[in-house]
Amino acid sequence: MKLLEIYDKQLVEQEEGGFRAILTRYLNKWIFTVDHKLIGTMYITFSIFAGIIGTLLSLVIPMELSTGNMLEGDSQQYNVIVTAHGLIMIFFVVMYCSMPAMLGGFANWFLPIMVGAPDVAFPRLNNISLWLIVVSFGLLLTSSCVGIGAGTGWTVYPPLSMMEYHPGHAVDVGILSLHIAGASSLVGAINFLTTVFNMKIAGLSWPKVSLFVWSVVITAVLLVLSLPVLAGGLTMLITDRNFETTFFDPIGGGDPILYQHLFHPEVYILILPGFGIISIIISRYSNKGIFGVKGMISAMSAIGFLGFLVWAYHHMYTVGLDVDTRAYFTAATMIIAIPTGIKIFSWLATLWGGVIKITTPMLFVIGFLVLFTIGGLTGVVLANGGLDISLHDTYYVVAHFHYVLSMGAIFAIFAGYYYYYAIMNSNRILGIVRYNEQLGRIHFWTMFIGVNVTFFPMHFLGLAGMPRRIGDYPDAYIGWNLIASYGSLITAFGLLFFFVNIFTPYFKKKALISKKFQRGAMILMGLDFSRDWQIGFQDPATPIMEGIIDLHNYIFFYLIVVAVFIGWVMGRILWRFAYKWSYPTIGDIEIFKNFTAYNQIIHGTVIEIVWTLIPTVILYLIAIPSFTLLYAMDEIINPTVTIKIIGHQWYWSYEYGDNSSNLVEFDSYMVYERDLNEGQLRLLEVDNSMIVPVKTHIRLIITSGDVLHSWAVPSFGIKVDAVPGRLNQIGLYVKREGTFYGQCSELCGVDHGFMPIKVEAVKVQEYLGRLYK
């Protein structure tokens, strides 16, 4: 009582000191604080603020895509919004609320407590890390408002990010923002590593350390090793822009693909901390210890190690890597699915036989398991170097990425926030603050439905060949885009319940909703889709595309079996073992366990080996046809016709062997823009129409005269990046006549959202006649 009286006396003296004393008190408490709990609270508050801005930007994107034309502005403005949304959600929400809500929010709050430390090792560095990220966020918002804005995409790939295509200082400010964000992450990672290794209490052995602490340690190690590489890549990029260096400029001997090797998307860094939170909540609400703790630690360590070996995963298969390199990345990416599968099965084994209590955090955990599993299965699809040729840079990739992050990391964030809500928000003045359970469940169900309605149709758009990062597209894609737009509104509506739920206890202690939550049915209106643009690939016109479709169906046979098995296990867990007593006693739990017909899965080495063998065998069965197709696609059999494709003007040059085996050269200017019917093809450059002979082996040589392009014709199974300074080649054999459409599907540095490509496949005689004509 004496300490409290002294504290109250100090508060009275400060209040009597006037405005200056009050200002000093608040500055010392919030701005200059070294208290790890206050810093953790400010990290989470900042992440919520950044999440609001990122979510508002994300709502603009589906609204733009709800119609086939640009609603307002041009494609540059659309790309600026896409870039800002991606950078904010990756670096300031997921990274600083999922990862440093392990290295920012949750970790600051609970990691010192879990290892028995009074605070972090370097409290002042902890404060610097927080305010660096705030400054970085301000610079990022500024970059979207300076000049034409930074419309490079969140990966900031050159040459599009070079001064020629993004003049002004918008990209420079964005690069500086990422530099400062990296410094903040690096400082935080070093701080937590030092805290765990130097301040862990003596009696706490490593096997007994919380899985959350393990996830933070592994993530921090990844950050310490990867962020300097990212900083080096950004430094080279900004010197290319301002100091005439040529690290990424082929004119001076550089290579724009080098940047893609350096700027590896840190997906594994982002998702690992969420694993720790999920493990804690599953253990708490199933009334069991986590199954196979050592196996879980080993799985996270393996994911962290393998994450450094798969940097070309799914986004570099088309840049011109040789076939052996692509085969390596295919194998390495499949292998990383094994420890991930071990974690999923171990979580299910923990739930199996447990006394489960369904609460809001547990609902988000179950949602995480379902949605992260879907994202992982589509990740196995994209890991295949042959199959990814058709799916690269389409909305299939967008769907996969968001299922892993928007529904993986973000659901883990919500689960952790609800789980620790009372601990983080209770104090002397307010007492114990609790969220409203019914509002939390409404938040979960609306968001769960919303994100699935938003992102699941994107798989179908990707299979049909719709490219990402465009604001304009053919009308054939409008149906699924419209459904995705409705889903984004449902998700935003669900987030309103979250904000009402977390802020209401500060103003009103009684529950807002007194009636029992009733589930509603959602009716989706059917839309009239053309058969060719529904839920599958476009009709194949080449053996390669037929092989891609066969491989896709083969892979999905196994993945559907896995998904059905996991779904059956989760259904049995929730149906048979759901325990609805609010406050079960130990005796009740023992009676319940003895009453059930199923025995609990005990901790043992045999079952952990089974968990490892199941994904290993399935991936081995998938790898055999995958490698067969990959090497078959690389073969170019005695090409009769060689076609060189040069972007950005899409100029075609032809070489055809005549009867004397001499090469006859032709150019592509056969169909001029003035000769096309009005409205036939939108946003033309010089010429985007070419002809090819059917049943003839063709070699395509693709390069670019300016920025990166992605030249794609879905019916051919072709998607090749046109890179300045590189000659990428691919074989082609068209089996049937017809007119096929493709697209340039990357950010090309020009004011267009969708550049269509028209390819006519005709008989050899007609082909030669049109060339000579």
UniProtKB/Swiss-Prot annotation:
It comes from Dictyostelium citrinum. Mg(2+) binds at residues 392-393. Pathway: Energy metabolism; oxidative phosphorylation. This is Cytochrome c oxidase subunit 1+2. GO terms for molecular function: copper ion binding; cytochrome-c oxidase activity; heme binding. The gene is cox1/2. It is a multi-pass membrane protein. In the N-terminal section; belongs to the heme-copper respiratory oxidase family. In the C-terminal section; belongs to the cytochrome c oxidase subunit 2 family. Cu cation B binds at residues 264, 314-315. Component of the cytochrome c oxidase, the last enzyme in the mitochondrial electron transport chain which drives oxidative phosphorylation. The respiratory chain contains 3 multisubunit complexes succinate dehydrogenase (complex II, CII), ubiquinol-cytochrome c oxidoreductase (cytochrome b-c1 complex, complex III, CIII) and cytochrome c oxidase (complex IV, CIV), that cooperate to transfer electrons derived from NADH and succinate to molecular oxygen, creating an electrochemical gradient over the inner membrane that drives transmembrane transport and the ATP synthase. Cu cation A binds at residues 709, 744, 748, 752. Its main location: mitochondrion. O2 binds at residue 268.
